[in-house]
């Protein structure tokens, strides 16, 4: 029960903070090319331009995966230090970790495309702020609305659900993650990765222009 409570709160925090953090990460990786106007220089490299999006995406993905792994390890160590009951519920830990990573990869694919397509990085940050809002309140939306906004997958892919018991009492129960949202996130990820590659392949190298 204590572990369930911890992971439920973690899912809520992920929905609020991860979209914004990913927006900043993707923006920083792409903004150096916008400020230095080095898109044309990158276009002279031996590698085709459609791999530029994928290479930057992989760099951000590795940073994101490392961050989520360290976060999970710190939470487990914290729980053991605080005397949480053992054994650790690995049947919850792994689905929550991979569910969070899956939802984050979608957000990263979208933010990477926006950051490369628009030179003004304020636009990318606004998209990240909107995603943070949807990720935080998405659990309150009906299921028909949540599937439209994959940011809401942070709550759906967490394996813990809050159930009201009374006026001021709540219980946390373990559930199976919603497989439909997994497939939906994968579909969005493939769409934006393909879109980003295609956009960079047709890149215009005029000064001040991006993908």
Positions of PLM-derived features:
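Helix-loop-helix units of permease transmembrane domains in multi-pass membrane transporters
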Residues: 27-61
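Terminal transmembrane helical anchor/hairpin motif
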Residues: 1-5, 125, 130-208
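Membrane-interfacial segments
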Residues: 31-34, 38, 74, 78-86, ...
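Secretory targeting signals
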Residues: 1-21, 54-119, 136, 169-180
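Cytoplasmic juxtamembrane interface segments
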Residues: 29-43, 105-133
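Alpha-helical transmembrane segments
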Residues: 19, 23, 27, 32, ...
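Hydrophobic/aromatic residues in alpha-helical transmembrane segments
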Residues: 22-26, 74, 110-111, 150, ...
């Amino acid at each position: 029960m204590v572990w369930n409570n911890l992971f439920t709160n973690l899912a809520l925090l992920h929905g609020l903070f991860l979209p914004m953090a990913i927006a900043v990460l993707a923006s920083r990786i792409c903004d150096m090319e916008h400020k230095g106007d080095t898109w044309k220089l990158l276009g002279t490299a031996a590698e085709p331009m459609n791999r530029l999006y994928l290479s930057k995406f992989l760099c951000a993905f590795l940073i994101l995966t490392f961050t989520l792994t360290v976060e999970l390890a710190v939470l487990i160590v914290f729980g053991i230090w605080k005397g949480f009951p053992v054994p650790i519920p690995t049947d919850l830990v792994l689905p929550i970790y991979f569910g969070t990573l899956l939802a984050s990869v979608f957000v990263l694919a979208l933010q990477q495309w926006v950051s490369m397509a628009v030179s003004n990085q304020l636009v990318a940050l606004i998209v990240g702020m909107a995603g943070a809002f949807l990720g935080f309140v998405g659990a309150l939306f009906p299921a028909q609305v949540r599937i439209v906004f994959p940011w809401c997958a942070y709550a759906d892919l967490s394996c813990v659900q809050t159930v009201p018991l009374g006026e001021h009492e709540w219980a946390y129960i373990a559930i199976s993650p919603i497989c439909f949202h997994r497939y939906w996130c994968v579909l969005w990820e493939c769409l934006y990765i393909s879109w980003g590659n295609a956009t960079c392949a047709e890149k215009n190298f005029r000064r001040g222009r991006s993908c």
